[in-house]
Amino acid sequence: MSDQANQGDLEIRPSPLLTVINDLHSKYKSLKEGIVANYIPELAKVNPDLFSISIVTVDGQVYQVGDYQQLFTIQSISKVFAYGLALEDHGRDYVLTRVGVEPTGEAFNSIILDEQSKRPYNPMVNAGAIATTSLIKGAGATERLNRVLEMFRRYIGHDVFVDISVFTSERSTGHRNRAMAHLMLNFGMIDRNLEEALDLYFQQCAVMVNCHDLAVMAATLANRGVNPVTGEQAVNSRYIKDILSVMYTCGMYNFAGEWAYKVGIPAKSGVCGGIMAVVPNQMGIAVFSPPLDIRGNSVRGVKVCEELSQQLGLHLFECVKVENGKWGVGNCEC
C-alpha cells in the first residue's frame, strides 16, 4: 500500500500534510465500528477493510494514502454534481420550484415532502436528488445519460462508466425510491417518464470512481468549478455558491448540524463509504471506508475529517490572525 502515486499532471511532493494523513490512516485503519451498506445487494459484497484518504489542492498538489485507486460506486455523492447540472440547465429560480434547500433532520431515504410546497426538502436526500435528476435536459434517455457521464468527465479529468451490476441491483430493489418518485409525480415535481428518471438516477449513483477522483472533484468545486488537473471549467462558477451552500447545510443528512459544528466545511457522503469535502479556495478532501454509522456516513471518514479540520484549522468560522494584523479564515499550510 503506497502513500504516493503519479496521477495525471498533478504534482506530488513531500509535505507535513502527507504526514498528517498518514498518521490518521494508521490511527483509524484498525477501527472496526460500523457496518457495510446491505440494502443494495451489490454493496454488501465490498471489503470493509478498504480505507483511503486523498487531498488535492487548487494549485495541483496531491497527498494520499491507502487504497486510493480502489474503484467504488459514487452513490449519493453524485447528487452534488447532478444538482449543478440541473442549475446550469434551468437556473436557480426554476430549480427552486422543484426542490428546496432546507435541511430535513430526517434520514437520506425519507419519503417526507414539504407540507406546503410539496417539494422535496433539498437535493441531497434521495427524493430531492430524483427530482433534480429528472430536470437534466436531453432528447432522450441515452442523451441524458451521456450528458451526465460527460459532466463527470469534466470534474474528474477522465472518462467514467456505470457499474451495470450495481445499477441493476439498485433498480430491482429500489422500491422506496420508486415510491418517492410516484409521490412527487402526483404533486407535479416530476413531469417526465418516471421510470426513465429513476433509471438515470440509479445510473448516476452507479458511476465508478476512486478516492483520488473524489478529491479532484472536490478540488474542482473548491477552485470555482475549474478542474485543477485539466484546467477545464466543469461547472459554471455562478453556481458554486449554490452547490456548496446546500452541501454545507444538507450534505451529511441528519448529521449535518453536528458536522457543521465540528468540521465546518461543505461535504457530501454516500452509502458507498465515501465522504467528499470542500475547503473553498484551498483543497478537496476525500475519504473512502465502507463501514457506515447509523446515519449512513462512513465511520472512519467522519473521524478523519473531524481531525483534519481540527489540526489544520479548516472550519469556515475558524478565525486566525495573519501577518498584516487582519483576521483570516482557516490555518492550513500544505
UniProtKB/Swiss-Prot annotation:
What keywords appear on the UniProt entry? Hydrolase
Please state what the protein is called.
Answer: Glutaminase
Q: Which residues bind substrate?
A: S76, N126, E170, N177, Y201, Y253, V271
An annotated GO BP: glutamate biosynthetic process
Q: Report which superkingdom the organism of origin falls in.
A: Bacteria
- Stored InterPro entries: Beta-lactam/transpept-like, Glutaminase
Q: Name one GO molecular function term.
A: glutaminase activity
Subunit structure, interactors included: Homotetramer.
Keyword Hydrolase in record: yes
Q: Does the keyword Hydrolase apply?
A: yes
Q: What is its EC number?
A: 3.5.1.2
Catalytic reaction list? L-glutamine + H2O = L-glutamate + NH4(+)
| Assigned protein family | Belongs to the glutaminase family.
